[in-house]
Amino acid sequence: MGQKTHPLGFRLGITQEHRSAWYANFNQYANLLKEDNQIRTYLNKLAKTASISNIQINRNGLSDQIQLNIETGRPGVLVGENGTGIKTLLSNIKKILPPNRQLTINIIEVEKVNLNASLIGDLVVEQLEDRVAFRKAIRKAMQSALDENVNGIKIQVSGRLNGAEIARSEWIREGRVPLQTLRADIDYATKEAHTIYGVLGVKVWLFKSEILAK
């Protein structure tokens, strides 16, 4: 039986970079990993309203400095009026961390939201939760990406589609999505839509281009 490999993990070091960049001594590793997970869990709760697409955590060697790079399609939502939002964000994340940690947050705007698998997934989820038919929701999201001249896109929705009694999976693809080609710059994201019929799973594969000289 065929096994599917995660498109991003498969390309680490080739077209993708690690989402956390740090090293630690053996006795510290578990605690730092737990800190990363707590930070991501907190930020993922804000992901839908703030359109957060990626969270990059960098630590400066064995010191207590943490640099948090947040890529978002709506930077104004995170920053807030007169920077109040970013101050609240900084304060809430520091509550998760030990008192000796020094935290820096960089907000990075995603310029082309229709070329980002995570933000396309958010668009599909938003429509599904508004009770739009799943095929219509997929087509609308795909068209927004195709207007940006991507090489290919595939979107899959799983669950009780349109309120059906039996759960199933359906997908639509436009263009090429070469998952076995390592030089292919594939963006991938998974999302959940909470509807009155239950939870629907959404997966988005986005083939941007081939990277030949990396």
UniProtKB/Swiss-Prot annotation:
Keyword Plastid: yes
GO molecular function, one term: rRNA binding
UniProt domain KH type-2: residue ranges: 39-111
Gene Ontology cellular-component terms listed: chloroplast; cytosolic small ribosomal subunit
Domain of life: Eukaryota
UniProt key word Disulfide bond: no
One GO biological process term: translation
Gene3D superfamilies: 3.30.300.20, Ribosomal protein S3, C-terminal domain
Assigned keywords, A-Z: Chloroplast, Plastid, Ribonucleoprotein, Ribosomal protein, RNA-binding, rRNA-binding
Localization per Swiss-Prot or TrEMBL: Plastid, Chloroplast
Pfam families per UniProt: KH_2, Ribosomal_S3_C
UniProt-listed InterPro entries: KH_dom-like_a/b, KH_dom_type_2, KH_sf_prok-type, Ribosomal_S3_C_sf, Ribosomal_uS3_bac-typ, Ribosomal_uS3_C, Ribosomal_uS3_CS
Family affiliation: Belongs to the universal ribosomal protein uS3 family.
Subunit structure: Part of the 30S ribosomal subunit.
Full protein name: Small ribosomal subunit protein uS3c
Name of the gene: rps3
